[in-house]
Amino acid sequence: MPDSTASATTRRTSERLLPRGLGDLVFQISLWLGFVLVYRLAWGIADHGGAVTPVARENARHVIAFENHVNALFEQSLQKVLLSSRLLVDLAAATYWLSQFVVLGFALLWVYFRQTESFTRFRNWLMLANVIGLVGFVLIPTAPPRMFPNLGFLDIEALFSGLTASSKGVGAFANPYAAMPSLHAADALIVGISMALVCRRLWAKVLWCLWPPWIWFTVMATGNHFWLDCLAGVLVTLAAAPIVDARFRFWRRNKPAQPKTVVVRD
C-alpha cells in the first residue's frame, strides 16, 4: 500500500510539473526553434543581399500616401503624446521588445503548464498567424515610419534607449523591413484574447483585454509601425482564427476514444 500511494503521489506531481510529459515539452520547444530558423531563412531569401531595402522603402511610401489620402496619417500625433512623458517613453520602449519575447513566452508557458487543454489551439493560432505574416514580409517588405525622419517620424528607441533593430544581440531576431503586417499587433491580439479566456480572476481578464490596444499604441508611437500595418496584423489574426478552429474541431471529432479504466477492488 505505501508503495502504491508513493507511486500515485509521484505520478500526480509529474503530471502537475509536466502535464503532457517531457517528450511533449521537448517537441514544443523544438517546434518554436524550427519556426525561428524558417523565419531567418525566409528573411535571407527575401533580402537578396540588401536588394530589398529600396523595395521596402517604396512600399512604405505607398502606405504613407494611402494614409494621407484618407486623412489618417496620425502616427506623428501619437509620438507627441508619447513624448509628453519620459515614463511613458520608457514603458513603450520596454514593451516593444519584451512583448514578443518575454510576455509571449510567459503566456505560452503559463497556458501550457496551467491550462494545458487550451494550449494547442493557442499555439496553432499564433503559429498560423506568424506564418501568414512571414509570407507578407517576403512578398511585401515594408519599412517602418522611423526610417523616414525627413517626414517628421522619430525613432523613439534610438533616441532614448539606444536599442534598435541593428543593435548587437537584437539583429538576429529583428527584421527591419517586416512592418507589414504587424506581428506585434497580431500576436498581442491573440495573446490578449487567449489569456483573457483562460484566466479566472476579473482583474487579470481586464488587464489582458487592455494588452492589445496598449501594444498597438506602443508600436505606432515608437515609430515601428503605421496604423495600416496594425490593421493588417489584426486581419491576419482574424483570418487565422476560423482555420485553427476548424482544424481543432476536426481533430476533436476524429480523436480516438480513451479506453475506460476498470478498477477491481478486493
List where the protein language model places each region.
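N-terminal transmembrane-helix/juxtamembrane module of multi-pass inner/ER membrane proteins
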Residues: P2-V102
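Short, intrinsically disordered terminal tails adjacent to the first/last structured region
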Residues: M1-T13, R253-D266
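Hydrophobic transmembrane alpha-helices
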Residues: G192-A196, T237-D245
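Membrane-interface loops
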Residues: G50-R61, Y112-A204, W251-R265
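Aromatic-anchored segments of alpha-helical transmembrane domains
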Residues: L37, L41, N130-V138, L210-M220
